[in-house]
Design a protein with these regions (language model features):
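HIT superfamily nucleotide-processing domains
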Residues: 1-113
Length: 113
């Protein structure tokens, strides 16, 4: 396994969770506080605290991660959806393990953030 932390909730979910999608190095799980009818989190197995540190992934792994985000949305039947990453406490990040929010199943307004 890639470097993980025993005290990290998301590291634990990558090892043992109710995955809606899985690929080598990445998992997707349902968000426990959904903001849309479909709201999943895409989590890399490797513990990287925030998007600021995305450079810890090499180019191939970064590409695979983005492809997995798109593949997860496809597998969930989403044609239109939102992908978000919260960076740091001021950006709304509460779990310090890089993850992508994939939200769909409803229309998002232009002025909405």
């Amino acid at each position: 396994l890639p470097p993980q932390r025993e005290d990290c909730l998301f590291c634990g979910l990558t090892r043992d969770g109710k995955w809606v999608n899985r690929a080598d190095g990445f998992v997707a799980v349902e968000d426990i506080r959904p903001l849309a009818p479909v709201h999943v989190l895409v989590i890399p197995e490797r513990h990287v605290e925030t998007f600021r540190d995305v450079g810890e992934f090499d180019a191939h792994e970064s590409k695979r991660m983005l492809e997995f985000v798109a593949d997860t949305a496809r597998k969930l039947g989403l044609d239109d959806y939102r992908v978000m990453v919260n960076v740091g406490p001021g950006g709304g990040q509460t779990i310090f393990h890089l993850h992508w929010h994939v939200l769909g199943g409803r229309r998002f307004g232009e002025a909405e953030t």
